Amino acid sequence: MNLINTVKNCIVEKLHILSDKKLIVLDDVILSKLIVDYPNNHNHGDLYTNAALILSSHIKKSPLEIAEILLSEFSNIKEISSINVVKPGFINFSISLYVWYEVVASINMLKEGFANVNIGNGQKVNVEFVSANPTGPMHIGHARGAIFGDVLANLLEKVGYQVVREYYINDAGTQIDVLVESVYLRYKEATGQDIVIGSGLYPGLYLREIGKLLYEKYGTDLLEMSFVRKMKIIRDVSLEYLMNLIKEDLALLGIEHDVFTSEAELLKNNIVEKCVKLLEDKQLIYYGVLEQPKGTEMQNWKPRTQMLFKSTDFGDDVDRALQKVDGSWTYFANDIAYHFDKISRGFQHMILELGSDHIGYVKRLKAAVKALSNNNATVDIKLHNTVNFLDDGVQVKMSKRSGEFLTIRDVIEKVGKDVVRFMMLTRKSDVVLDFDFAKVVEQSKNNPIFYVQYAHARVCSLMRNAPNILGIEDTDFSVLSSKEEILLIKLLAKWPNVVEMSAKTAEPHRITFYLIEVAEAFHVLWGYGNKNANRRFIIDNDVNLTSARIYLAKSVAYIISSGLKIFSIVPLEEMH
């Protein structure tokens, strides 16, 4: 039951009636601008619409005059109890009380299915996230993007999309050459040789394990092998070991990908060449000289002829180079080939999660996808910002002297998976987030995950102590009449819209904010019961009032449970 959609459909129906009477002008363009939403201020009613404002540009009347015309029909919408028009022409609605009581009944009948909406209609969507370089275990800096991508995938599945979770393995390029050289040193160390780790190599002690693994399997044979052969062996063993390590770290976060795509395999299968040929056939490739990039020093830049992609034809700021001076492909060329591969696998809708330092790739990648798909495919790029790790307000040192970083495993052992997953979604993804190890284990309202879980646990405690109650159909919910009870019901009614808008905007943090708001409203209501026995959920000798209040409490639990499950977090029945 999405109240906004219900009222919006009624408004559209009434607008068509007025259009048929020639009182207004209506078309699809006007309807596409129609807004029905919850106001930011409770004093402005329960819902508002901009209908009069969008119609005024097509009729020689002011928005306030048009609003008066609309009222003649809007007042007949049964869900609306009163209407108020405010300048410059917004129409505010108050919703009839019976609708709010139906919300409580509906939640208890549908339970966690109350917010089930189908906006995806089974459409395939590819969500690529994490895609960390396979050069070491995942440090905690990777967690935010990993959790964001996984929760977004859960959310899209809830609203009817067929989701494929994908990880792009960057197993080609300089960083892998450096990895292989670093591991070879650790292998030599395992054979008993003294080593010196030069600058530019990976110093992490975790590479010792790969060196030992190679020594156990090959003894000293690698020392005698040809350079090409031993480098291939070291590369294959290192990548397998490190990808298994990454998968284990992701599993600790509750994350599992469906598909792993290798950059090296794409290059081996000449996907870049096929992609470039397609762009050439579309006359989107040319050879030219780019202007000097802003911020570069003259001595570091020389004009040169390069193979360029006409990305400006598709909204980019400049055309993009596809080949380096030595003839090898640029990172961007490899990246558009990878998205060409996704398109070839039938994905018309792709979502890519990247760190905010990749903001420069947004326009060029969108341009490439448009070009490769004849504008039939889209890529939505979601950026995540950094995380400041604190311990009671003091910055936590992220790196160790060994060259290793604070890992996902370290943090999960300290505070638990569910805490990490929830806290990483307490800010919009492109905003810097503070993660305070002391705060996230506090049992107080200052700790959002505790506050939400405590609300759910309180309802579960209530249910364990509750007497037998009336059936939903036999309960008169009109006894829920206090201001706080009605405000809580109105908040619960927003849940289907919160889910739908979170999915449409690819912003799961909206759910976090909402769950915190629900928990706060419930704790306030609980607090009134501690002060006044008549405000408690269980009232002796009044089975109807008790039933109504318990159904209200259960509504809170169903919605919190539903929200936490989108996050792959287990709702707690008892606080520990």
Swiss-Prot record:
EC numbers: 6.1.1.19
Catalyses which reaction(s): tRNA(Arg) + L-arginine + ATP = L-arginyl-tRNA(Arg) + AMP + diphosphate
Chief subcellular location: cytoplasm
One cellular component (GO) term of this entry: cytoplasm
GO molecular function: arginine-tRNA ligase activity; ATP binding
Biological process, per Gene Ontology: arginyl-tRNA aminoacylation
Record-linked NCBIfam families: argS
SUBUNIT field: Monomer.
Protein's name in the database: Arginine--tRNA ligase
